[in-house]
Swiss-Prot record:
GO BP annotations listed: ascospore formation; DNA-templated transcription elongation; DNA-templated transcription termination; methylation; negative regulation of antisense RNA transcription; negative regulation of reciprocal meiotic recombination; regulation of DNA-templated DNA replication initiation; regulation of DNA-templated transcription
Residue spans of biased composition, Basic and acidic residues class: 411-452, 555-568, 682-734, 755-768
GO cellular component: chromatin; cytosol; nucleus
Domain notes: The AWS and SET domains are necessary for transcription repression.
Entry-linked InterPro entries: AWS_dom, Post-SET_dom, Set2_fungi, SET2_Histone-Lys_MeTrsfase, SET_dom, SET_dom_sf, SETD2/Set2_SET, SRI
Protein name per Swiss-Prot or TrEMBL: Histone-lysine N-methyltransferase, H3 lysine-36 specific
Domain SET: 92-209
Compartments where found: Nucleus; Chromosome
Enzyme Commission identifier(s): 2.1.1.359
Name of the gene this protein is made from: set-2
Family statement drawn from the similarity comment of this UniProt entry: Belongs to the class V-like SAM-binding methyltransferase superfamily. Histone-lysine methyltransferase family. SET2 subfamily.
């Protein structure tokens, strides 16, 4: 039974005395399993890594971690990884009690959620001959309770003399827990997990009949209504299936069919499993990693081979497909633990190779890390011509692939700009520009070339980023003069805002689309939000009469200035002139637009009311999603505000805005927040590494130096103010709230594209 609530007839023992200390005297406690030489191997060539990003929720149950989904614990993972329960001994709160007929039992001292890790089954991992010897010894000694658990074929965990508290977990015919086998590093380990919600005071149990012990049958005292009366022994296959719930789902058969196979009434070859779905992929891949029986492996591989859905095949590849297939091929033609005959080995190998042919070949990363090339290479000399031919074809195709290299992560800068986020980030860059990224190595956000953060027409090409930054001027939602509704629904005031005092010489002002004033200097080719400060050269001063003739020093200064201007490349001059003309034209068009727009009418009020309602509705969902990311409180509040406003604007454009958040829309909102916050976190990580001008090399620095030198020659002291303003801007635009990305200037946009071609990121999302 599964669900959030325990059944009404749950057996509770709230008043039973805690006898943990007494129970610990009956055996030697081990912190972890001990292994006989050569036992407990997970058959993994190397430790498998996931592609989760660092953060407080990394690799948790909602992260989609490929390791967690396939019952693999992360080993070399990021800080904050939530998938290290065996390694961290993150056990549930339990104690030991004394039962009436079953001896000691394990009791929950706090509520345990469904799926939660309860305890590891710790003991001595022994081989089959040792298992038989100890069984005889324990029988001679009159041991009433056996503590054998099968780890994998031919290997057992014996917790009789040495073990952990998990040994006291009793059998039940209606258990609230179950056993799972997990890969931890290069070892296979076993843990007890909650199958449903377990109440405080309830005994933790699981079904012993799922795992073979080889002991004599014993009477069952579980007290459940469906109790079969005994456990263990040779007759256990007749009382219950020995296949776990995870393996049942992986096989794609009904429990009735599985029982028929176990009893020999049906053959697995005569049954057709269900079509493989994306939801079952993780169970199939997790089960394939364990050394199952031959008929089980055949059924699971058959489900994969018969599947024609590309999304399912992509999921199989993502869930460590190359590594698991390499493991199966190695075992099939090596020690052959499955006991396959020659015909079965050929069939299994052909199935695997033909599946590998279906998979998209983008980069060589997963192929190389799985070491499957060496395995396939050994098959090129196989006696079966079909196997040899397909193996050679795969090797030839893989040889043409390129490796992709991950850009090192940068630490978060606590003093960095909280609103400036890279417009496009790339986790990996291939050696060849013609090769695209591997879809399963990096989470890719789909691109919409026609949409910016507000749904307006903007492209993210280098030419766009080098245009006037007015295109990306953000609007702080906290500004009282900003409109409360969407830009197109509520008209801006007809009269633009004006600066409160006179501007310094050379400075002009204009209004952005929201009516907010910004300042620009055509001569210096800069623009900013802050009111410009007057430089000494432009400050008014008392006339002191006509200037006298220049001396030799003044003439030399003029000559240097003239030479500096002559040395300036024509391309830079033409680019500057083009930028100035563009700035002037945009400012003129914006001023005409503001003057031509009528004042807000009464018809805007319903839109404002609608926007207010949507804001309240979305504010109940968005902050909870944002809080999952590792950002400070103020930054989280600001990002939540921005995201809510963006989503409100989008909803108001629809004929019928939503009145409530359905499960489907909640899922899409979650994806939107994930993409938005991913950019925020990535930008913060880059700033932590001190890369304030990403991709600017020596050539870019020399170009900056030449420009600054030329400006000093032409403008003297006034350039210091310009450099100061420009420096503040390049540092992070502290006054600029985040919308679509950083406010790129000409130089940063130009140099950033020289090193890395960043993917375009679409912040547009369809909530319908």
């Amino acid at each position: 039974m599964s669900g959030n609530n325990s059944p009404i007839n749950a057996q509770l023992f709230p008043d039973a005395r805690d006898v943990t200390k007494d129970a610990l005297q009956t055996f030697v406690e081990l912190p972890e399993c001990t292994y006989m030489k050569g036992l407990g191997s997970s058959q993994q060539a190397e430790v498998m890594a996931c592609d989760c990003k660092p953060g407080p929720t990394a690799c948790d149950e909602d992260s989609g971690c490929i390791n967690r989904l396939t019952s693999i614990e992360c080993v070399r993972c990021c800080k904050g990884c939530q998938n290290k329960r065996f390694q961290g001994k993150k056990y549930a709160s339990v104690d030991v009690i004394s039962t009436e007929k079953k001896g000691f039992g394990l009791r929950a001292t706090k509520d345990i959620a469904a799926g939660e890790f309860v305890y590891e089954y710790v003991g001595e991992v022994i081989d089959e001959p040792t298992f038989k010897e100890r069984t005889a010894i324990y029988t001679t000694q009159g041991v009433k309770h056996f503590y054998f658990m099968m780890l994998q074929k031919g290997e057992f965990i014996d917790a009789t003399a040495k073990g952990g508290l998990g040994r006291f977990c009793n059998h039940s015919c209606a258990p609230n827990g179950h056993v799972e086998k997990w890969v931890v590093g290069k070892r296979l380990r076993m843990g007890i997990f909650a199958s449903r919600h377990i109440q405080r005071g309830e005994e933790v149990t699981f079904d012993y009949n799922v795992d073979r012990y080889g002991a004599e049958a014993q009477a069952c005292y579980c007290g459940e209504k469906n109790c079969v009366g005994f456990l263990g022994g040779k007759t256990q296959t007749e009382s219950a299936s020995k296949v776990s719930g995870t393996l049942t789902a992986a096989l794609g058969l009904t429990s009735r069919d599985i029982n028929a196979i176990l009893r020999g009434k049906k053959s697995a070859e005569d049954l057709r499993p269900r079509d493989l779905t994306v939801q079952d992929v993780s169970k199939v891949m997790a089960s394939l990693m364990m050394n199952q029986e031959a008929w089980q492996v055949n059924l699971m591989l058959q489900r994969i081979a018969l599947c024609t859905d590309t999304s399912v095949q992509a999921a199989v590849m993502k869930m460590h497909g190359y590594q698991i297939f390499a493991q199966i091929l190695t075992a099939t033609w090596g020690d052959n633990p499955l006991g396959l005959d020659d015909s079965d080995r050929v069939n299994v190998t052909l199935m695997l190779l033909r599946v590998l042919q279906k998979w998209p070949r983008i980069t060589k990363n997963k192929i190389s890390s799985s070491q499957i090339e060496n395995v396939v290479k050994s098959l090129t000399s196989n006696d079966n011509s079909d196997i040899a031919t397909i193996a050679q074809e795969l090797l030839s195709e893989w040889a043409n692939l390129k490796m992709a290299f991950r850009i090192p992560r940068r630490k978060i800068d606590p003093d960095g700009d909280e609103h400036s986020v890279s417009r496009g980030t790339s986790e990996e860059v291939t050696k060849e520009s013609s090769k695209s990224e591997e879809p399963n190595d990096v989470e890719v956000v789909k691109v919409n070339k026609k949409a910016d953060n507000n749904g307006n027409g903007v492209t993210d090409s280098p030419s766009t980023r080098s245009e006037s930054p007015f295109t990306f001027i953000p609007t702080p939602y906290s500004n009282k003069t900003a409109p409360k509704g969407p830009k197109k629904a509520v008209k801006q005031p007809a009269s633009p805002m004006v600066p409160p005092r006179s501007l310094p010489k050379g400075w002009q002002f204009a209004n952005d689309p929201q009516g907010k004033v910004y300042y620009y200097n055509l001569e210096l080719n800069i623009q900013q939000w802050d009111f410009p400060k007057a430089s000494r050269a432009s400050s008014p001063s008392t006339p002191k009469g006509p200037k006298g003739p220049k001396g030799p020093r003044g003439n030399r200064r003029d000559e240097r200035r003239d030479n500096s201007e002559t040395r300036e490349p024509l391309s830079l001059q033409s680019q500057r002139e083009s930028d100035l003309q563009r700035i002037i034209e945009q400012a003129r068009l914006q001023e005409v637009k503001n003057n031509s727009e009528p004042a807000p009418s009464a018809s805007a009020k319903p839109v404002n009311a609608q926007a207010h309602r949507l804001t309240k509705l979305l504010a109940k969902v968005v902050p909870n999603q944002v809080s999952k990311y590792d950002v400070d409180r103020e930054r989280a509040k600001k990002c939540s505000k921005d995201i809510v406003q963006i989503l409100v604007d989008k909803e108001l454009k629809r004929p019928e805005p939503m009145t409530e958040i359905s499960d489907e829309k909640a899922k899409k909102i979650k994806e939107f927040v994930k993409g938005y916050m991913g950019k925020v976190v990535k930008r913060l990580e880059e700033k932590e590494g001190g890369a304030k001008d990403f991709g600017r090399g020596r050539q870019g620095n020399r170009r900056d130096s030449e420009r600054q030198s030329d400006r000093r020659g032409r403008q003297g002291q006034s350039d210091r103010d310009h450099s100061d303003n420009h420096g503040r801007k390049r540092k992070g635009e502290e006054n600029q709230p985040y919308e679509a990305g950083p406010m790129y200037d000409d130089e940063s946009a130009e140099t950033s594209t020289e090193t890395v071609k960043k993917p375009k990121v679409d912040m547009e999302i369809d909530l319908e």
